[in-house]
Curated annotation (Swiss-Prot):
Keyword presence, Nuclease: no
Name of the protein: Elongation factor 1-beta
Purpose: Promotes the exchange of GDP for GTP in EF-1-alpha/GDP, thus allowing the regeneration of EF-1-alpha/GTP that could then be used to form the ternary complex EF-1-alpha/GTP/AAtRNA.
Organism lineage: Archaea, Thermoproteota, Candidatus Korarchaeia, Candidatus Korarchaeales, Candidatus Korarchaeaceae
PANTHER family, alphabetized: ELONGATION FACTOR 1-BETA (PTHR39647:SF1)
Length: 92
């Protein structure tokens, strides 16, 4: 049996300050896992005025439209003001 290839996608997510970054990460992790994606790690970068940018490292099956699906999950979360895909790479 051939294993399906996976991708690593790095997203930059800006939080609007209405929830803490810890709470945002918990929600992001849960929503991604519910859709079959995995949050592998993240970096937190305070920008100022209560705005925080999160650089999320997410793995998912390599499928057509998968990055759009991940973006949709992230954009629908409370406290997220913007989502930007920075990079996609095949990981296996």
């Amino acid at each position: 049996m051939i294993a399906m290839a996976r991708i690593l996608a790095i997203y930059r997510v800006l939080l609007d300050g209405s929830i803490s970054s810890d709470e945002a990460i918990q929600r992001i992790r849960k929503e991604l896992e519910d859709k079959g994606f995995k949050l592998e790690g993240y970096d937190e970068n305070p920008i100022g005025f209560g705005i925080v940018a999160l650089n999320l490292k997410i793995t998912a099956p390599e499928e057509d439209g998968i990055t759009d699906a991940i973006s949709s999950v992230l954009e629908e979360l409370e406290g997220v003001s913007s989502v930007e895909l920075d990079m996609v790479s095949r990981v296996g």
